Amino acid sequence: MTPQAAPAFLETDRLVLRPATAADAPDLLALDNDPAVMRYINGGRPTSAEDIRDRTLPRLLHDHACTGTRGYWIAREKDTGAFLGWFELRPLADHDAAVVELGYRLNRAAWGRGYATEGARALVDKGFTDLGVQRVTANTMAVNTGSRRVMEKAGLTFLRAYTEDWPEAIEGSEHGEVEYELTREAWQRGR
C-alpha cells in the first residue's frame, strides 16, 4: 500500500490524516533531518535511518486498545498528496483514553499556512466526540512561540510552566517547558 493509499483516519478541508506505514520512513527521515524542524526537539541534530526504523516507526505504528486506534497520524495535503508531517493524539496511559497528549511535527513547507491549527483542532474534536477523551494536554519549550500559538488556536489554555532535567540541554531549554490543556467541559462550552 503506498503512503497516499493508506485509509484515512480523519479528513479536514485541506488535510488527510492516516495511519503511518513503513513506506513513510523516507518522509519521516527527511522531516527529522531538517534542523529547523528539530530545533525544539533535539537542538537540530540529525536523525539516522536506523532511529526512524527502530524508534520512530514503532511509536507511530502502536495501536492503543483504549481508543481503538493509533496515537499518531501522517498528514498529507488533500489536494496534492504532499507529505506535511504527523499529528499526535496519544493516550498518556495505554489502558485509559481519558487524558491524551496533542502533538504535531510538520515540515517547513507547511509552516505558516494554518495546517497545524487545522489538524490539531480536528483531532481535539475527534478525541472528545469519538474516542472518550476527557482532557487534552500539550507541552513544548517555553520559547517555542509557534507551537504555543497552535495550542491556543486549538482551544487549549496555559496550565503551568515547569523545568525538566534533560540529558542534553538544547538552546532555549534554560527557559523551561510549558503545559497547556483543554478539558471536555471547556471544549463543550466553547462549541
Model-derived features with residue positions:
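Acyl-donor (CoA/ACP) binding surface of acyl/acetyltransferases
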Residues: 1-40, 76-191
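Catalytic Tyr-X3-Lys helix of short-chain dehydrogenase/reductase
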Residues: 60-61, 128
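Helix C-cap/alpha-to-beta connector motif
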Residues: 62-66
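Short, high-confidence coil segments that cap the C-terminus of an alpha-helix
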Residues: 68-70, 133
